[in-house]
C-alpha cells in the first residue's frame, strides 16, 4: 500500500537537524491544513505554492518528493 507524501515526510522530521528536508518536515508537521492523505505531485505543489510560507524554496519540496518516490520503489 502506497503511503502518502505527508506520512513519508514525517519520517524525515528531526528538530535537531537543520537540513532543508528535515526543516520542511518539521514545519509541515505544524501545518494543520497540509494535505495529509495526498501523494500527487501537482496537488501537493499547488498547495505549497499557495500555503507553504514556511518553505523557502520549492526545490526543497522537489528534493523531498524525489526521496518519497524512491522510497516507494524500494
Curated annotation (Swiss-Prot):
Record's Pfam families? YozE_SAM_like
Source taxon at top rank: Bacteria
Recorded hits in InterPro entries, A to Z, give: UPF0346, YozE_SAM-like, YozE_SAM-like_sf
- HAMAP family listed in its UniProt record: UPF0346
What family classification does the UniProt entry report for this protein?
Belongs to the UPF0346 family.
The family database entries (NCBIfam families) matched by this protein are listed as: PRK13672.1
Q: What is this protein called?
A: UPF0346 protein LCA_0996
Report the source organism: Latilactobacillus sakei subsp. sakei (strain 23K) (Lactobacillus sakei subsp. sakei)
Amino acid at each position: 500500500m502506497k503511503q502518502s507524501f505527508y506520512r513519508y515526510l514525517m519520517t524525515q522530521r528531526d528538530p535537531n537537524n537543520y537540513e532543508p528536508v528535515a526543516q520542511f518536515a518539521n514545519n509541515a508537521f505544524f501545518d494543520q491544513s497540509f494535505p495529509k492523505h495526498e501523494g500527487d505531485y501537482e496537488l501537493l505543489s499547488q498547495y505549497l505554492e499557495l500555503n507553504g510560507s514556511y518553505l523557502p524554496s520549492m526545490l526543497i519540496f522537489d528534493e523531498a518528493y524525489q526521496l518519497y518516490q524512491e522510497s516507494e520503489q524500494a
